[in-house]
Regions:
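Residue-level detector of anion-binding/catalytic polar loops
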Residues: 231-232, 303
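FAD-binding subdomain of flavoenzyme oxidoreductases
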Residues: 263-274, 280-464
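N-terminal flexible segment immediately upstream of the FAD-binding catalytic core
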Residues: 2-224, 241-280, 309, 435-436, ...
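Generic non-transmembrane alpha-helical segments
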Residues: 171-182, 221-231, 296, 460-471, ...
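Glycine-rich, histidine-containing beta strand-loop boundary motifs that form or position
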Residues: 235-239, 246, 258, 286, ...
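Glycine-rich, acidic/polar active-site loops that bind/position phosphate-bearing ligands
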Residues: 341, 431, 444-465, 469, ...
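Flexible, glycine/charged-enriched surface loops at secondary-structure junctions
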Residues: 180-189, 304-309, 392, 399-407, ...
Length: 527
C-alpha cells in the first residue's frame, strides 16, 4: 500500500524524447522584436525571427539584425531568405514532403538550387571584401561568411532529413505492423495535417505518424514499439481539448487516435468493491463519443454525470485524461467522482487497471479517504491476463479539491492517481466503467438576468449555491447545475433578452433545480 507522496519516476508520454535547442522551445519563445516578413512562402504564424532561430540559431539572427542596416542592394539577403523559405515551406507542408520523397530527382534539383544561391552569396561576399577591405568591410564579410556556413549546414540537414525520414518510416512500418494492420499506420499528408493541432488551433510540429488501432488490445504493443523507435507518444480522442495536450511538440511523434475504440456496453447493475448494494454502471471504450454514453444512460432511466460542452464531439478517454466536468458536476462531481474503474497503458507498455473501492456514488471530497486498487498486467499479453504487481493507493478525499476553488486544473499529479487529469502524460486511457445516477423526479430551470455591473452580480452565484446546498441538507430542493454566461458569450450566441427591460444583460445565470418533492422545488425556484 502506498499513500499520496511525490510523483513516481516515470517517463512522460507526450514530452519530446530529445532536446532540440532550435526546435519547439525556440519557436514559441516570446518575440518582442517587430515581426518582419521577408522570408517568402511563409504562410504560417511564425515570424522571420522564429524561423531563422529554428533553422540557423540565435547567433545567425543577431548577425542578420546587424547587417540589415548595412544593406545596399539587398540581393544577398533576398537569396538567403529564399533558401530559408524553400526549406521552411517544405517542412511545414507534409504534401510537399511526400512529393519530394517520391521524386528523388526533383528533390536533388531543389537542393542544388539552394546550394547555387548560397554560392552566389559567397561570391558577392568576396567581391564586397575586395572592394571594401577596411575594418567595417571585414566585419561585414565575417558575418556574411558565418551566415553562409550556417545556411549550408541547414541545407545539408534538410537534404539528410529525407533519407532519415524514409528509413524511419521503413522501420516504423515493420515494427508497428506487428501490432496493428498496416492500413492503421498513416504517414500521408492528410492524416498528419488533421492531427497537427486540437481545438486550440496551436501548431508547432507535424507528427511523424498517425496510428488508428482497431482494438484496445493493440495499444500496449504500439506504445512499446513507439518508444523503441524513439518516438514521443501523443494520445488523441476527439481533439476537442483547449489545453494543447494533443499538440505535437516534436517532429518525431506518434499520435495514437483512439476513435475506433468505440465499444459501449449496456447499463447494468454491478457489484463494486466495498459497496453493499449493486450500482448502475456502464462500460465504454476510450473512443466512444460522450453523447452516446449520455443517451445510453437516459434510455435506461439513468443520468451520466459527465457532460462537458463538447459532449457531441469529445471522447471518453479524453474525459478521463482531462477530468472533465460540466453542468452536472455541481450535483455529482467531475469524471474522477464518477469512475468505478478504468484501464490504461503506461509508458512501459504494460496494462494498468485502476479500481475504486468503497465508492460513495457522490463527490469524492465528501469522504475521508478514497481507496484505489492498482493492478499492472504484462503488455505482451491480453488485458488482465498476466498480473505483474498490485498495490492499494489511499488518498485523503479533500486532497482532490482545492478549498475555495474546487477542481484545481493545475494539479496534474492529483495525489499520484494514474490517468485522471494527466492529459495523457502518464499513459493512454483505453476504457472505463462509470457510475450512473438517478435524476430526481422534478426539475425546474431558472434563468436570471443581471443588468448592472457584473462585479455586483457575482456574489449572487455564491448566495444561490449556499442557499440550495442548505436546502438539500434538509431534504429539500437540490442544485443540479449552475451555468454563468457573460456579456461577450451572450452576444456571440445571439441571446434574446427575456425581461421587458430595453437593455442587454451583463450576465446570465442558468440553474437547474431538482428534487423528488414538487412543492419544495417550486418553493426554491420562487425564492
Amino acid at each position: 500500500m502506498r499513500t499520496a507522496a511525490g510523483p513516481p519516476n516515470r517517463p512522460n508520454m507526450n514530452a519530446p524524447q530529445v532536446f532540440d535547442p532550435h526546435g519547439a522551445a525556440a519557436a514559441v519563445a516570446a518575440d518582442l522584436a517587430p515581426r518582419l516578413r521577408e522570408i517568402p512562402y511563409n504562410y504560417t504564424s511564425f515570424s522571420d525571427r522564429e524561423i531563422v532561430i529554428r533553422l540557423l540559431g540565435e547567433e545567425a539572427w543577431a548577425a542578420l539584425d546587424e547587417l540589415r542596416g548595412e544593406r545596399r542592394t539587398g540581393r544577398s539577403a533576398r537569396m538567403l531568405y529564399e533558401v530559408l523559405g524553400d526549406i521552411w515551406v517544405v517542412r511545414r507542408n507534409p504534401y510537399l514532403q511526400d512529393d519530394l520523397l517520391d521524386n528523388p530527382k526533383r528533390r536533388q534539383m531543389l537542393i542544388d538550387a539552394l546550394g547555387h544561391r548560397l554560392a552566389e552569396i559567397d561570391k558577392r561576399r568576396q567581391a564586397d571584401l575586395s572592394e571594401h577591405g577596411d575594418e567595417p568591410g571585414r566585419e561585414r564579410a565575417s558575418r556574411v561568411a558565418m551566415l553562409t556556413v550556417a545556411a549550408r549546414g541547414a541545407v545539408d540537414a534538410f537534404a539528410r532529413e529525407f533519407e532519415q525520414m524514409a528509413e524511419l518510416r521503413r522501420r516504423a512500418t515493420k515494427a508497428l505492423g506487428r501490432c496493428t494492420q498496416k492500413d492503421n499506420i498513416r504517414f500521408d499528408g492528410l492524416a498528419r495535417v488533421s492531427h497537427v493541432t486540437d481545438a486550440t488551433d496551436w501548431r508547432v510540429e507535424y507528427p511523424f505518424v498517425i496510428l488508428t488501432p482497431d482494438t484496445e488490445a493493440e495499444i500496449a504493443g504500439l506504445i512499446k514499439a513507439c518508444f523503441e523507435l524513439g518516438l514521443t507518444v501523443i494520445p488523441r480522442g476527439g481533439g476537442t481539448g483547449y489545453t494543447g495536450g494533443a499538440v505535437p511538440l516534436t517532429p518525431f511523434s506518434a499520435v495514437i487516435n483512439t476513435e475506433k475504440l468505440e465499444q459501449l456496453g449496456a447499463v447494468e447493475l454491478t457489484e463494486l468493491p466495498g459497496v453493499a448494494h449493486k450500482v448502475p454502471t456502464i462500460f465504454s471504450g476510450a473512443g466512444v463519443v460522450t453523447r452516446r454514453v449520455t443517451e445510453a444512460a437516459e434510455a435506461a432511466g439513468y443520468v451520466f454525470a459527465v457532460d462537458p460542452t463538447s459532449l457531441d464531439a469529445s471522447c471518453i478517454g479524453g474525459n478521463v485524461a482531462m477530468n472533465a466536468g460540466g453542468k452536472k458536476a455541481v450535483l455529482w462531481g467531475t469524471a474522477l467522482d464518477n469512475l468505478a474503474w478504468w484501464r490504461m497503458v503506461d509508458p512501459d507498455g504494460n496494462w494498468l487497471e485502476v479500481t475504486r473501492h468503497d465508492h460513495n456514488q457522490g463527490k469524492i471530497h465528501d469522504i475521508a479517504v478514497a481507496r484505489f486498487e492498482l493492478k499492472w498486467f504484462d503488455g505482451a499479453h491480453a488485458p488482465g491476463e498476466k498480473l505483474i504487481r498490485s498495490e492499494m493507493l489511499e488518498i485523503e478525499g479533500k486532497r482532490f479539491r482545492k478549498e475555495g476553488l474546487g477542481k484545481d486544473v493545475t494539479d496534474k499529479f492529483l495525489a499520484g492517481l494514474p490517468g485522471v487529469q494527466k492529459e495523457g502524460c502518464d499513459g493512454l486511457i483505453t476504457s472505463a466503467r462509470w457510475v450512473l445516477h438517478k435524476m430526481p423526479a422534478h426539475t425546474r430551470t431558472v434563468c436570471l438576468e443581471f443588468f448592472g455591473q457584473a462585479r455586483e452580480a457575482i456574489p449572487s452565484i455564491v448566495e444561490i449555491k449556499d442557499y440550495l446546498f442548505e436546502t438539500s441538507k434538509q431534504g429539500g430542493a437540490i442544485l443540479a447545475g449552475l451555468e454563468h454566461l457573460d456579456e461577450r458569450y451572450l452576444r456571440a450566441v445571439g441571446y434574446a433578452t427575456k425581461s421587458k427591460r430595453n437593455a442587454f444583460p451583463k450576465m446570465v445565470l442558468i440553474g437547474d433545480i431538482v428534487g423528488d418533492d414538487a412543492d419544495a422545488v417550486a418553493a426554491a425556484t420562487r425564492k
